[in-house]
Swiss-Prot record:
Gene3D superfamilies: ACP-like. InterPro entries: ACP, ACP-like_sf, PP-bd_ACP, Ppantetheine_attach_site. This is Acyl carrier protein. Residues 4-78 form the Carrier domain. The gene is acpP.
Length: 78
């Protein structure tokens, strides 16, 4: 899967889980500040990323994923 395909899937998950429009999402968007996620939203988003991309994201890594691009970069590395 290419980085562009991963980005598209991550954006789709964010739209689905957080109820934002795709055009509101930018790579530098912060889940909490820019997209309105609370801590539960963030946990659910991480779980959905794990399911969609078949990766395990340990809590210590999940805490470091605060922006859309950080999520994409993490998945690309796995």
């Amino acid at each position: 899967m290419t980085e562009a395909e991963i980005k598209d899937k991550v954006y789709d998950i964010i739209v689905s889980k957080m109820g934002v429009n795709k055009d509101q999402i930018k790579p530098e968007s912060k889940f909490s500040d820019d997209l309105g996620a609370d801590s539960l939203d963030t946990v659910e988003l991480i779980m959905e990323l794990e399911n969609e991309f078949d990766v395990q994201i340990p809590d210590e890594d999940a805490e470091k994923i605060g922006t859309v691009q950080q999520a994409i970069d993490y998945i690309v590395k796995k």
